[in-house]
């Protein structure tokens, strides 16, 4: 077994009979001097160092500010294929798209279709309209309606949700008695009279039947395309139980549609 000396790096045996004198050169290790600058030994002879140029701090700050603005307001066309910033909406755009603020109509939370909202146009196309003289609207307006049009109503799921909610509201509190708006009286006791609403899409006034719901104020106060049924005499045709001699036999939910007399 051999031990190595730290100074001479000479192997020294632990046995006395195998000991030999060290023959290596003794070296003294010193710490390198602390210097801030050291000459470049690999510099090509004949070349001199460049003189240090004066840097203006104001110009440097201006360059940094321009770089930050260039990075912040970069062009719309970028090399990256996907930029999530393009799909971010501001708070104003989010409020416009929200159903609570769409057309300032509280009934939009029930119906989210574009043409069921009272803030949309009654026409279902963006093409230019034909003149009233050449269109079918003049001919249809002059002839009497034998069969009432198909009513605008909720689908099965929305209707079930609304009925359950209104029934729960009617069980908790006593609903007020209100004078019928269209002169329609529900034969079933314990319910409120029929309440109608004016649709801006079709320009007609519809009477709701079989729904224990009443809202204070007119549903459509923003845009009134037709006057209320108080001013125009209407004929409320019941479609709940059509008679045998009815003009149009149409199986639909309980809805009363007005027909304006020419």
Curated annotation (Swiss-Prot):
Q: Determine the domain of life of the protein's source.
A: Eukaryota
Question: Transmembrane segments in this chain: where?
Answer: none
Asked if the record carries the keyword Mitochondrion, the reply is yes
- Write out the annotated subcellular location: Cytoplasm, Cytoskeleton; Nucleus; Cytoplasm; Mitochondrion
Pfam families (UniProt xref) = SMRP1
Cellular component (GO) terms are: axonemal A tubule inner sheath; cytoplasm; cytosol; manchette; mitochondrion; nucleoplasm; nucleus; perinuclear region of cytoplasm
Q: Which residues form a coiled coil?
A: none
Q: List the disulfide bonds.
A: none
Q: What does this protein do?
A: May participate in intramanchette transport and midpiece formation of the sperm tail. May play a potential role in somatic cell proliferation.
The family note in this entry says: Belongs to the SPMIP6 family.
What name does this protein carry? Sperm microtubule inner protein 6
């Amino acid at each position: 077994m051999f031990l190595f000396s730290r100074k001479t790096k000479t192997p020294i045996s632990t046995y006395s009979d195998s000991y030999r004198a060290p023959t290596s050169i003794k070296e003294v290790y010193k710490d390198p001097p602390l210097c801030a600058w050291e000459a470049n030994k690999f510099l090509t002879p004949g070349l001199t160092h460049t003189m240090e140029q004066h840097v203006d701090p104001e110009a440097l700050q201006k360059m940094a500010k321009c770089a930050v603005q260039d990075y912040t307001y970069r062009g719309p066309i970028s090399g990256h294929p996907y930029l999530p910033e393009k799909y971010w909406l501001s708070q104003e755009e989010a409020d416009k798209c929200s159903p609570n603020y769409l057309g300032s109509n509280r009934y939009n939370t029930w119906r989210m279709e574009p043409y069921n909202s009272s803030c949309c146009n009654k026409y279902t196309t963006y093409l230019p309209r034909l003149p009233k003289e050449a269109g079918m609207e003049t001919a249809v307006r002059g002839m009497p309606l034998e069969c009432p049009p198909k009513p605008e109503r909720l689908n099965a799921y929305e209707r079930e949700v609304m009925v359950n909610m209104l029934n729960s509201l009617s069980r908790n509190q006593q609903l007020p008695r209100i004078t019928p708006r269209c002169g329609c009286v529900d034969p079933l006791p314990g319910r409120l009279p029929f309440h109608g609403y004016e649709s801006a899409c079709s320009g007609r006034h519809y009477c709701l039947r079989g729904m224990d719901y009443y809202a204070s104020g007119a549903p459509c106060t923003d845009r009134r395309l037709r006057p209320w049924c108080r001013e125009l005499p209407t004929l409320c045709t019941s479609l709940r139980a059509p008679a045998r001699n009815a003009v149009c036999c149409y199986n639909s939910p309980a809805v009363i549609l007005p027909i304006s007399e020419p």
